[in-house]
Regions:
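Acidic, contiguous N-terminal accessory segments
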Residues: 21-133, 163-165
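Feature activates predominantly on carbohydrate-active enzymes
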Residues: 60-70, 74, 111-318, 350, ...
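Bacterial N-terminal signal peptides
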Residues: 7-18
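Catalytic-core regions of glycoside hydrolase
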Residues: 203, 278, 286-517, 523-527
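Structural motif
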Residues: 56-61, 96-102, 139-141, 183, ...
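Positively charged n-region of N-terminal signal peptides that target proteins for export
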Residues: 1-5
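Extracellular/periplasmic catalytic domains that process cell-envelope and extracellular macromolecules
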Residues: 48-49, 88-89, 129-132, 171-173, ...
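Catalytic domains of carbohydrate-active enzymes that cleave complex glycans
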Residues: 458-716
Length: 716
């Protein structure tokens, strides 16, 4: 019976593979992401073909079937021919995949010694000898670990890894590695630039779109193990019984790939709709008249809801909460604290192993005149008061996903509370899905940022991976850039940011350059000239974007609402801290927000010696200069040029870089798939126009205050 089932699986895999080959013949539309396995490393192809001719996957679970399918399709594409063998022929196989216990049970001569700290998701890829035969073993403590190892093995064949005497061990540095979807139930995606939501709520639970499994497959290939399905501005209906059945159907589809589902919840969900005017923002689905977290009836409602959820989804991950922020309800409405609200939900989830991710994105103007200080002031005094299954989830910077910010001082400031880092994969402030901006470089700058919370070496990475404060649980979240566009992300190169997030979430020690190289070789090909030039393009693209948008620490000077183009002149908005002039503070004397000890004293929220460094105009890193200081126009920079001249230089440098990317891409025309080439060319042309608009708009506006000539160092 098992042989017959395997044959059917092979037939389905071969048919699927034939369809993939045929679709590739008409061009790369981006749907296959980095998983097409179309580009083996030619320098090692002969070695690969000699060493890998047969495969056995031990086990018959759905996860094992997926491993079998992935290796069959991937190795056939890369090597030309592969034989999938039954477990009974394990001794004859070149590649063996299975949990250590299962491998040992089948062949007592093979007793994989896995590292004791491999955990439930780590894996080992190792050469071994069975009699006279040299084989390779992919093993783990669990089938999910074997799945991760199998995807990594396919990656190795495309990035030039020799298989001779290979011994590789990999384990995730962070426990919860999540995507956050800002998807609304009506199909719209907040800050989404790649079409509508993937989730077809109107068809669920009866119809499971094949794209859901492709989504899970892509995430599993880079180690993402959880997804928050809906917007943090949560519609209470997501907790209704009919929607929970839909969520359960998605959870069933994702589970074999090691992916758990989470939900954003509205704090007012227990309230009856009749008690609120704006149902989607404040009203609920319950029968109560309030959602005070200390009210026993409110606590009971959440406990009963948790029982309902876990009956449908036994491995449900937990709740993400946006509370008392931008109009969303929360515990402060009842005179309670953020800890009171989070702990109520944590109590409901704790019996089932669920977690609460309570966002620190709050900026009540009554807390402090400086928006950048508010989250710290609200949350740091609560350190140690959150339940053990609560994360405080903080954005990387203290304002809002700007092109560049210093790290939020809350990181390092709450040693007794697990902190989850929230990054934004979607490019809300970095050109949407039009601009080529590789975010791996940005995220590495943040992860390597030294908070000095416990002296030198207290990096952001060490805070979120638990090593600095010995946190009992660790997490990282990425606000996704995925939609129902054929290529998933709107821009072909935006796929690299999804990929980079997953790889860094698994191992933040990887370099941005290594990750870019992996993605290029799997997505575009192996040509060494192409790989080198595209890597160079990607590695400088984020700094270029900062330069043509918000250089030297400028921030939040974009279009109101849409956040795409420049609007430094914006001075009227529903809130003062939604205007541009609030942040740049340009006047006849200079430019920048004074957050020094003589200004708002935001520098005081950082540990020494950072606080002193940021406080000093002379030694403050110039990339943060206008974030922390109001600087005279004629101030002499490290280059010897004035602030005004340096501002001009940065804006022109940014646009020059985009011009260079266009030239480089044109040189690669014959080395890139025609469909990809045309798609990216069109995006780059628009990026060139946009970058010039940013430069000219901002310099012309700031010139009104500096009264100095716009200069370009390259033409002076």
């Amino acid at each position: 019976m098992r042989v017959g089932k395997m044959s059917l699986t092979l037939l389905i895999s071969l048919l699927s593979w034939q369809c993939m080959i045929e679709s590739r013949a008409v061009g790369n539309d981006g749907y296959g992401l980095w998983l097409s396995c179309s580009f083996p490393d030619q320098s090692l192809l002969s070695e690969y073909q000699d060493k890998i001719t047969s495969v056995v996957v031990i086990g018959n679970s759905r996860t094992c079937e997926i491993i079998r399918d992935e290796l069959n399709a991937g190795l056939t594409s890369l090597l030309g021919k592969i034989e999938i063998m039954p477990e009974s022929r394990l001794n004859e196989c070149d590649l063996i995949i299975g949990p250590a216990s299962a491998v040992t049970n089948l062949n007592e001569l093979i007793s994989p010694e896995l590292p004791v700290d491999l955990g439930p998701e780590g894996f080992m890829i190792s050469s071994l000898r069975i009699g006279e035969r040299e084989s390779i073993l992919i093993s783990a403590n669990t089938e999910i670990g074997c799945l991760y190892g199998s995807f990594h093995f396919l990656r190795l064949l495309q990035v030039g890894q020799s298989l001779t005497q290979i011994h590789l061990v990999s384990r995730p540095r962070i426990q919860y590695r999540l995507l956050n979807h800002w998807d609304n139930l009506n199909g719209r995606v907040e800050r989404g630039y790649a079409g509508r939501s993937l989730w077809k709520w109107e068809e669920l639970p009866d119809s499971i779109d094949s794209r859901y499994r492709d989504y899970a497959r892509a995430n599993a290939s880079i180690g993402i193990n959880g997804t928050v399905l809906n917007n943090v501005n949560a519609d209470p209906r997501i907790l209704r019984a009919d929607y929970l059945r839909k969520v359960a159907a998605l959870a069933d589809a994702f589970r074999p790939y090691g992916i758990r589902v989470f939900l954003s919840v509205n704090f007012s969900s227990p309230i009856s709709a009749e008690f609120e005017v704006n149902r989607n923002r404040h009203g609920g689905i319950g029968t109560l008249s309030e959602s005070d977290p200390l009210n026993p009836e409110v606590r009971k409602w959440w406990k009963e809801k948790a029982v309902e959820i876990y009956k449908l989804i036994p491995d449900f991950g937990g709740f993400l909460v946006k509370a008392n922020s931008e109009g969303m309800p929360g515990p402060l409405d009842y005179g309670r604290s953020h800890a009171d609200g989070a702990n109520m939900l944590a109590e409901a989830l704790a019996p089932y192993g669920g977690v609460v991710m309570w966002r620190s994105f709050v900026y009540n103007a009554d807390v402090d005149p400086d928006r950048a200080k508010r989250a710290y002031l609200d949350f740091v005094p609560l350190d140690g008061r959150f339940a053990k299954n609560v994360f405080v989830q903080s954005k990387n910077g203290p304002v809002d996903f700007q092109p560049r910010e210093p790290v939020a001082p809350i990181f390092g400031g709450m040693p007794y509370t697990p902190l989850m880092l929230e990054l934004q994969i979607t490019q809300e402030y970095l050109g949407h899905s039009t601009h080529l901006v590789y975010l791996g470089s940005m995220w590495k700058e943040y992860l390597e940022f030294d908070t000095f919370a416990r002296g030198e070496g207290s990096t952001l990475a060490s805070v979120i991976d638990g090593t600095l404060h010995h946190s009992p649980m660790t997490g990282i979240a990425g606000v996704t850039n995925i939609g129902d566009n054929r290529n998933w992300t709107g821009h072909f190169f935006a796929q690299a940011n999804w990929y980079a997030f997953g790889r860094l979430a698994w191992d933040h020690a990887l370099s941005a350059e290594q990750i870019a190289g992996e993605w290029i070789r799997q997505s575009l090909g192996q040509d060494p000239v192409m790989v080198e030039k595209v890597t160079s393009m990607m590695m400088g693209s984020w700094e270029a974007c900062v330069n043509y948008m918000t250089p030297l620490g400028l921030h939040h000077i974009m279009q109101e609402g849409f956040h795409y183009g420049p609007q430094p002149s914006l001075e009227r908005a529903p809130r003062k801290d939604w205007t541009s002039v609030y942040y740049h503070r340009a006047d006849s004397l200079g430019l920048g927000f004074d957050r020094s000890s003589n200004g708002s004293d935001a520098v005081g929220q950082y540990f020494s010696p950072l606080s002193e460094q940021f406080d000093s105009l002379r030694i403050c890193p110039e990339k943060y200069l206008l974030w922390f200081h109001h600087v005279p126009w004629d101030y002499t920079m490290k280059s010897g040029r004035t602030l005004w001249q340096s501002l001009c230089d940065h804006y022109y440098s940014g646009t020059d870089y985009v011009n260079g990317m266009i030239e480089t891409w044109a040189e690669l025309k014959n080395k890139i798939d025609p469909e990809v080439y045309q798609h990216v060319s069109e995006k780059l042309k628009q990026q060139q126009k946009d970058a010039s608009i940013w430069r000219d708009t901002c310099l012309n506006y700031f010139q009104e205050f500096s009264r100095m000539k716009i200069v370009n160092v390259q033409t002076e």
